[in-house]
Every structure is written in C-alpha cells, then in structure tokens.
Amino acid sequence: MHGAGEQQQRYRYNARSDEQHHHPSTSSHQYQQQGARQMHQMHPIQATLMCTPTTTSAAASTSSSGGSNSSGGSGGHRQQGNILRIGNSIKIGDNILEPAGTLVFSQADGTPWTGQRIVVNGSTHAVVKANLFPIGTTPPVLNMQSNQNWYMNQPSGTVPMSSNAPATTSSATPDSGIQSVPTSPPSPSYAMMNDVDIGDHDDEEDDDGPADFTDMPLLKPVDEDDDCYDVPCTSEGPPPNNSNPAITTIPSSCSTPAPPKESLPTGMNVEEWGSFLIASNMDREEIVRRLMAHDPEMAKAIAMRIRELSAEESKKKKDMEAEVSSTTPTTPRARGTRTRNKCATRSTNSPDVTTSNLPEEPSTSTMGLVKENEDVEKVEGKRRGRKPKKRRGFHKESFEDLESDAKKSKAEQHEDHLPEASCSSRPESVIPPPVDPIQFRLKVREMMERKLEQLTQKMSEDMTELRLSHLTSSKMVNGERGKRRESFLRQLNEQSKKLRKGGMLGRKRLRMFMTESDILEENKDNIKKEVKEESTPPPTKLRGRLPSRRTREPSEIVNPEPVEKKFNGEYFEITKSVPSSDDIIPLWMAPSLTCGCTKGACTSDMDCLNRALRVQCSSDCSVPYCSNRRFWKEDCGNKLCVSNGPRSKRVLKTKIARRAGEFLCEYAGEVITREQAQEKFAQDRDPRIIAIAAHLFVDATKRSNIARFIKHSCKPNSRLEVWSVNGFYRAGVFALSDLNPNAEITVDKSDLLPFDMACNCGATECKRVIRGVRWRCADPNEKIVTRRFVIRNRRKTIERSSHSGLPAILQTPMDENSSIRLKMKQVLAAFAFRVRKIDGSMSRTMLPHYTLIIKFLKTKGNNPNPVEFVSLFRKWLEAIDDDDLERAFVAIESHYMSSSILSSSLQSKKAKDNAPRARALSTSCPSPVPSKRGDADLSYLESLYPIGSYDPDDAWESYSTNKKGNAVRCICGALDEEGTMVQCDTCHFWLHVDCCQYVVRSNEKAQKSKNPPSDDGEYICDFCTNKQNGLRPSADVKLTEQPDVRFENCDYYRSLINRRGIQVVLNETVYVNRVLPEDHKAMLRNLREEKKGSKQKDTNKYRFPKAATSPLPIEKVDRKNARIFRVERLFVCPGNNRFVFGSFYAWPHETYADAGRVFSKKEVFATPYYETLPLDEVIGRCLVLDTATWCKGRPKVPKFKEDDVFLCEMQIGKTQRVFEKVPPKNRYPINTNSYVFTEFTHPKKVVRDFRPYDPSNPSPKPPKTSSIPSTSSIDPPQSSSDGLPEVDTKKLSKRHIQRVLKRLVKNGSRRS
C-alpha cells in the first residue's frame, strides 16, 4: 500500500432527471406497471476509482489515440466520445494526477442501464489501474468490488459532464509516484445486481447532435446532499455480463426465494413458510395479519418484546446524548440535512456542522453501507494516525412510535411535494431524528450542573474535614461542633438545590420552540405544584453565607414589595429597612470607611476601626476572614420567636441562649423623616417609631420584621445600636448580658421616640416617662435683628444641626505628610461621634472635656503636643467610665495617630529633661541609666509578712462542721464540690470519691489489717485514721482520668507536695522564684508528646535522672523577688521528677503603660506567658480573685494574710501594651458558700490611686474601674492642661435654664 498522499472522495448516484422534476407521477406509474412483472430491487454497489500519476506525453498520446482498452481488464471496449470527469486534476511537474474516489450507484426506478461492464476474476488483491486526464477522450475506469469479484464498469455516453461535483469537493495530495489502493471488500450482506432484461426498458438512442442526458442519473458527492435525497429510490441493476460466469443471479429484495427443505423448521412445509414469511416491503396490516393468523399469543409476546427493546434502546440513546462532552453536536448525517462542504485534508478532522434540521428518512442502503464505511474510516484513521470514530447503532421503536412517525413523514412528504410515489409500497422504517442544537446544549447544561453538584458535595466534605471557622479558640464542645457541621451541610444542600433549579432558564428558552399542547401541559403541572405548595407550610430556609456577603451592595436599596402578611395582615414582613421614598436616600446614606486591618479577622474593638465606630466592613476588606459583618446574619426566624397572645401582649423571646454583645436582629422598617414621624406618632402614639439619626426614623408599624415586638424597659437586657452598613444607616439589637432560652428581649427607648410617652414597664427602677428625642435645632425662620455679629454663627449652628452620622473629616485621606493637628481633629471627631447618642446629642458630663480638647487644638497652633492631647483624652475616659468607649479609643488612636508620633515627641521631651543629668554624670564616673523597673516605686510590695513567714493551712486545725453540714475537706486540698462526694461518719466532712478511691486502693492491705470497714457501710476518712499529717491536707492525688494529650510515660496529678512541704493544687496560685534555674530544660526537651490511645514507634532512649528526696527549708522571700504563678497542670516524669505547668501574673510596674495610668496596689494582670517549672521552685501560696469576689469577702480555709490576696480584672498581651478584660472562660472562681467563705459587713471598694512611676502625682479623681491602656509608654505631661477645672453641673444647668427663659420672654414680647 502506497499510503502517503492518497485521497479518496465519496460520490453518490442521484436519480435526478427532468422527468422526475417536472412529472413526478410518471415514474410512479411506470413503477406500478413494472410491479406486476416483479421488479428487482438493487442494493447500491461501492465502486473505487483508481488513479496513478502519468506524464504529460503519455496523456497526450493516449488522448489522441482514442480507442485503447483499459489497462487492467479484458473483454471491454472504450467509447471515445463520452468522458466522465470526476474532480479537478492536479499538475505536478510533468505529471498529471487525477483524484481517486468511491462511487455509490443507485439506479432510479424505470431508468434503463446502458453501460458496458468488464469483469475481472481473481483474488481480492487484484487491482485495475487507469490513467485519467483533465482533457481527453479516455473514459474513466471504475473498479467495483462485490463478493470477492472485481468489475470494470464503463458508463454510457448519456452521462453528462455537468453532473460532476464542484472542484471544492475533491482534493488530492500533491505527491508524485503514489498509487491508490481500493478499500476493503464490503460485507457479504451486500447483494449483487440482478440480471434484468434490458429490452423491458425504454432506451433512448444517441444521435449525431448533442447528447441527451435527461434520463441519466446525476453524479453528486455525498457531502453535497440535495433535497431530492429526502426520499430514497430503488433501482434495477444493469444487465449482467454474460461473458463472466462468476456472476450469480440473486432474486430481488422484494421476493425471497424458498429455502431448501432441510433448512425449514420442524413441522413446517414450504407453503406454510411462504404464508408466514415477512418481507421488508410488506404493509403493516399484512404483517400484523400474518402474525395474528399464525399464533395470537405469540404475536402479543412479540409486541411486548418489541416495546421492551424500544424502551431500552431509547434509554441508551438518552444516556449517550447526555454524556456528550463536546460543545458542538456531532450527529450522524441523514438525508435532508445540509452540511458544509470541506476539503478532506490531513488536518481536517472536525465534524460536520449542521446548519438546518430536516426530517430524516429511512434508506434501503443505509444499513448495508454502515459496515463498509466503518472499514473505510479505520483505514483512513490508521493513515492519519488517529483512532476511528465510533458510530451509533440504529434503534427500533414500538408500534405506536412507528405509526406516529409514519403519519409525520407522510405529512411532510405531502407538504414538500417530493417524488415519493415510487416508494409508496416499501416499508417505513424509523431512524432517530437529528439532534437539535438547543436540546443538545440543554443536555450539556444539565450534565454540567450535575458535575457541579458533585464537586460541591465533595468540596463540602473536604472543607468540613479542614474545620475552618472564625473562632480562634480550639476548646469547642463536641455537640456545638456537630451542630455547626450539620448547619453547614444543610446550607450546602440548599445551595445545590438552587443549582438544580437553575434549569428553569433552559425551560424558558425551550418555550420558544414548544407547541401549544406542550405549553398547556406545562401550565397544568405548574397549577398542580402551586396547589400542593399552598396546602403544605413552607419549610424554613437557611440563607447561604458567602453569597449573601458578596451580593449586598448599596445599589440594592430599592423599595421592594411586601414579602408576606403576618398576624392576619397586621404588618408586612421585610428583611431589612427600606426607604419610604426616593427623597430619603440622600439623607439616609452614610460614608464608608476602611478599617486598615492587615491581620486577624476584625474581631476586636481595640484593633478594628470600623468595629469601634460601628461601621460594618464591606466586601473590599483586606482581611480574608472578616467577622465584622453582623447584619448579613438574617437568622431572626431561627433563634427568635414571638410569644402567642393578644396583640398588646406579644413579646419577642429567644429560642436559645445568647451571649452578651451578640447581634440579635435588625430593627427593620420604613425610613422616614422627622416630620413624617411626628405626624404618625401624633396619630397612633405607637412606640415602634425609632430614631436612627437626628432627622431619620424607622417606622415599624406597617412594614417590619419580628423586631417590632420588642418592648421598652427601663432596665433592659439589650440595646439598640445604629451601624453603617453598605453605605446606609441601619439599626440593630445587641444583647447587653447573657440571655437564657425563652428570655424576653427588651430595650430602653429613651431618646429614641419622636415625643415623650408614659412608661409602664414595671421595672423596679422605672422612670415613669420615656423621654423623646430632644430637638436642639434652631428655627430657620427666626429673625435676628439686634445681634448681627452672631448671624453667621447662628446659620452654622442650623446647618450643623441638620447633619448627623459619621463626620466628613474621617474620609480625608491620610498619609505620612499629614499634619499632626489634622490627625488630632480626626481622633476627636471619631471619638465624639462614638460617644454621642443616636439623636446626635452629647451628655452634659462630657461637654467640659470636649470643649477643653477643642480649646487645646485652637490655642496650641499647628504643632500641638501629642502627649498632652492623649492625657486630656485619658481624663475624659476616666470620667466616662465605659469599657466599650475605652476600647474604641484605643482603635481610633492607633489608626489615626501612629505610635511613631508619640515616641518621637516622647524622646525629644526626655532628651531635654535628661540633659542636665547627663552633664552631671559626665563629670563623675560613668554609670548606666537606671532601668524602668529600677525607676518604679516598689514600696507597695513590702509587707510585715514576707513569703514563707506563715502557713495558710494552719486554719484547718480549727476548722470543724456538724453532721448536717456541707463542709468540704478532702485530701487533695481542693474545696470545690464537683463530682461524686462521700461524707465521713466520724468528722462529717465531705470528700471527693475519686480522691478517696485512689488512697484506699493504694493502702488496701494496711486498711485490712488496721481499720477494716464496718458491716453497716460506714466510711472513715484518712484524717480520722491519722493517715494525714494532722488535720491539714497533705497527699499526692493522682487524676483518675489522664488528659488526652500528655507527655510519654508521665503521670498527671490533682495535687502534689514538693520538698518544702507545700501542697500545690490544680487551678490555684502560688509564688515562684523570679530567678529560675536552667537544669530542668534538658529533661523537658527529651519528653515526647503523645495522644491517648496512640503508641510510639520507638522507645525513648533518654535516661531521666533520679530526683532528690532531701527536704528543703522554707525561706522568707520578699514579694518583689517573686512572681505569681497560676497552676494548670501537675505531672511526674520518670525518675520522680515533678513539674508544674501554668502562666504568670504581672505586677503593675511590670506593664508598659503611660504615667497617667493609675492602678490598685492589690491588682495583678494575667499574661499569655506559659512555662513549665520544677515543683520545688514554688516558695509559697497566694490567692488571686476576681473583682466581685475580692470585694465580697475572704475564704476561711486556707486563711491568707491580706498582703497575699490579689484581684485580677484585666489581662495584657504579649507586648504588655494592650489591656482588656479577662474573658469568663479564663476566670477561676472559688467556693463562696457560707461554710467556707466569710463575707464582709461592708463590701470593699477597689481604689486605684497608685502610679508606680510617679508617686508624687496621684490621680485627682480616681475612677471606679481600670482605665484603658495607651499605645506607648509616656511620661506625665507638664503643662497647664493637667489640672481639669472643677465644673458645677448644677450651676451650669441653672444658667442654661435662665438663658432659655429670657429668650422665651423676649420672643413673647415681640409677638405681642
């Protein structure tokens, strides 16, 4: 095979004559006449046209000779005057190469066959070659292949040259010296042409004039189909060549010859076989009649089997269409489908593109050509280096489908006026219609949605394994984690359902191509679905988190329609506030700010500027897991409920427990102006109209959510806050304290209503009146005649009163070159906005501090001192005494005033102060500058009772109880009442069962011999059996349940005793040495961590040294040389080496705070510094309490001196600059029952008047609680602004009232 460069072009014989076009009934009538003589139906035969490169001279000589025979055959002759040209020639140098192609002949009905045939016998490898020339008289040589026989066919002179395909339909490879090899022989199912009498046809004779080609079939490429191919035509084959005895005669396909008697079924003769025979051209009724006449039961079984096979084939076809991955539909080419003609080149492998969709008609030659076409494509694929394409099989349909398709085909044939009369007697077979591009795209879309759903489900499973959450704490209850996981999976399932419902768009597009009956059926289904949905309550929907974040933009502010009527039309349900008109939107808009956070999740008010100013972060926040987006949590329906009852007694309650500071819901309604609020409130006196700004109100009377049922209380458990969300002001309800399930939510509506209203809340501190918004707006129509110099100020006041919300100065861009004064103004504006009320007013107690800072900025010029500025704010914050505002100021100060500004001013000031000291030191011997700790005043740590001077456990000797008492005295030394406890029948103290079981188990033999238990079940503790050292606890108690994560080969204890005789108990505080040894770190480095149930692969080869057992003396240590340590774990490693693990507490002088900060001498601060120390480093015991317990009383046992009892309310960070309150989970409460705790007659007060770095300058007005930290360590300002003048608020208010009265008197006199 000479493979390279060979090309083959397929052609098809088309029964296309003028008679058929102009007189379609002629061929039908002729066919009916010939049907009486039992016309033979011929199957198309494949013919291969071979070509070889020839020289120009040879072409010329051959064309001029005119009468040469074919080079590969015998017994035939050439006709010089009739040339059939197929394609265009290609000239390569001196050679002319004609393209090779495959011809498919199908003789039309009634068309005579006049060609001559030359038969060549031989093997399947026989090749007949011929030279074709672009111009000449040499006819083409056709090499036809059928049943291992090879023929050479010469067409008659009636074949027109105009019937050739256009030049674009054929192609050849410009490669000389290449010979084409015919395709493989067709399958044996292909029938040969029958011997037909030529004389039966009306042949037209040639004359000397131009040839008449009207009765000849046209030669047309397969790729260029025409409308005439819609109806296949049967034809008779040409007369056989009598000179070739190898040709066998086969009857027509319309009549099947009787088989021999031996091949008939048992019990059937030839007559019965003829009556039962079913031919392909029989009528349906005839087939059914024969089946029913033979065996009715068998006919029914055959019909059922046909239906089953049809259903299976249809299902396979749908599955095959659904799994198509290409975006362009590749359908089997059918008759009546126009395709683009493309040159078959080596690089052309793209499928045909369907441009129009016509009904596909059955063909008598389709099934016979499928196999050979596959063989041709396999050969082509091997030559081109690609795999052959798979073809789909043809499916059978049921009788009902056959009838419907037959009717459709008849109707289409009648409409198109196609010459189908000649084919009326053939059976109708059904071929699957071509794939519609729209349906194909819909199928691809459905397949992509299924894939997307699978990927989403897989991604959700992977994400749940990662355990991503906004919470940074790893201590999460398993039940809570399971609930969150279920909620997350539920949200993903709902999102996947929405994706599946996305096919509605495809159905809408498909409606354009629906018929009226399809639309009516779809409407009926929709009506049924709506009826079903109305009969069942709608399920609760969980909204997805990620989509709701990204889709909430300011452009969403529209006036939506009411969602649903609630409580019999009492109000319309909406999810968020909406404007009442378009005129409200400009007044409602709020400026947007950027928090500038680069790490974390915007969770702290001390770090995030937006959270400090009550601004919700937008989607442009630089932090990837920003949690400052409270208002997108629209879960009011899941965590809140409205109690049933009359209209006036409905209240809003919680379904589950809520924590302090948690967002509960949004107070939604219509946003209206002040005038509209006054009009509505005057009519209804409804307290649901709430102010969100000086001139804006939210009306929750007609359109709102369940927040409208929140009641007023003078002692509320929640509060209303106004936040800037996506550029608009929205009101939210936040919890003030921890709320239990089924707790009523109440807020204080003072200064929020349009007018005053009577209060009947029933609280113990009820004010009896709910104050309305105070209107401090001047009348713009007021005329000022006499005092003209204040007209400008009056107008400015009127203009400022109309503005509310975030100050515009906060939007000024900041850079390093900005002036310090501008930054200070921004700090003042931001903090003033934070301390103002919702209506824009400021408390009278804050006005003196506010005016003092404004005066400072005006008098100090362009470069005011930042240290003095910060100190003024410190005094203001001490007067406010609000932890939320303190944290907000830290965030505002750190954002607008960087620490570099403060540090630079501080260094310049210290340089001036230390200049004389430096000169004095330079004259004498050089000495180092005293450290900060050395500069601090440590006299507050001095005491008459140093550490180790007394034993707190001495109080156990006098501690007693009675039989009915609940006092606890356990060998572990702990006083908590957790777990199961047992009471001693001798001393009547209660003990922990876990602790006692360990001691009983370890001393089982001693107890059996000395004091066995009585038969009555009495229990006698170790204190009564003298196993303890007196009446004080002194034992090592091991934990019954070891921790899950622990060191290898280590045991963990509840209490341990060191060599000094001090019993160290879990969760208690002790003193440790300030200077610690380093020897124990080698053992700690060789300890390997393990989890419960896991095994180490290799053993630990490190040998732990044995611990010393000699007792250590108790030393007296000053407190300034010791540190306070919180015990969190006690363990013993191999060699009886005992260790304690915990965290340190910091003294006030160990924190980095400014000199203006005041402390309490009994105050310590929790730190994040953890350490593992030897147990022998514990030198004493102390007690650290929370503020409430410290003020309440002291424990009876162990009894500490007052110098060893401390309070802890704040904790500091690693930098020791940021102070915040200790969270509840890090607090360590003690037993405050009366049997072990003594309360004070008058509770103590925390006095903060101590400054460790400036003892000579105490605070003029000590606040009640601790103040906030500063971002840097600064010295006290030395300026006249330190002393804040005392302001008598009573006198100030009296003066203000007098001025108001005078103004009213003047206005009244003018009007009169």
Swiss-Prot record:
Domain (SET) spans 638-750
Domain of life, per UniProt, equals: Eukaryota
Q: Which GO terms describe its biological process?
A: ectodermal cell fate specification; egg-laying behavior; embryo development ending in birth or egg hatching; embryonic digestive tract development; locomotion; methylation; nematode larval development; nematode male tail tip morphogenesis
Extent of Polar residues compositional bias: 1-11, 25-36, 344-367
Q: Cite the BAH domain residue spans from the record.
A: 1100-1223
Chain intervals with Acidic residues compositional bias: 200-210
Keyword line: Activator, Chromatin regulator, Metal-binding, Methyltransferase, Nucleus, S-adenosyl-L-methionine, Transcription, Transcription regulation, Transferase, Zinc, Zinc-finger
Q: Where is the composition biased (Basic residues)?
A: 383-394
Its localization reads:
Nucleus
Q: Where is the AWS domain?
A: 590-635
Q: Where is the composition biased (Low complexity)?
A: 54-68, 160-176, 1264-1281
What's the chief localization of this chain? nucleus
List S-S links within the chain: none
Q: Spell out the molecular function terms from Gene Ontology.
A: chromatin binding; histone H3K36 methyltransferase activity; zinc ion binding
Q: What class of enzyme is it?
A: transferase
Q: Which portions of the chain have biased composition (kind: Basic and acidic residues)?
A: 312-321, 371-382, 395-419, 524-535
Q: What is its EC number?
A: 2.1.1.-
Q: Which Gene3D superfamilies does the record match to this protein?
A: 2.30.30.490, SET domain, Zinc/RING finger domain, C3HC4 (zinc finger)
According to UniProt, the reaction catalysed is: L-lysyl-[histone] + S-adenosyl-L-methionine = N(6)-methyl-L-lysyl-[histone] + S-adenosyl-L-homocysteine + H(+)
Bias regions of kind Gly residues — which residues? 69-78
Tell me the Pfam families matching this sequence.
BAH, PHD, SET
Sorted alphabetically, which PROSITE patterns does this protein's record hold? Answer: AWS, BAH, SET, ZF_PHD_1, ZF_PHD_2
Q: Quote the protein name from its UniProt record.
A: Probable histone-lysine N-methyltransferase lin-59
Q: Which organism is it from?
A: Caenorhabditis elegans
Mind giving the lineage of the organism this protein is from? Eukaryota, Metazoa, Ecdysozoa, Nematoda, Chromadorea
Q: Which gene encodes it?
A: lin-59
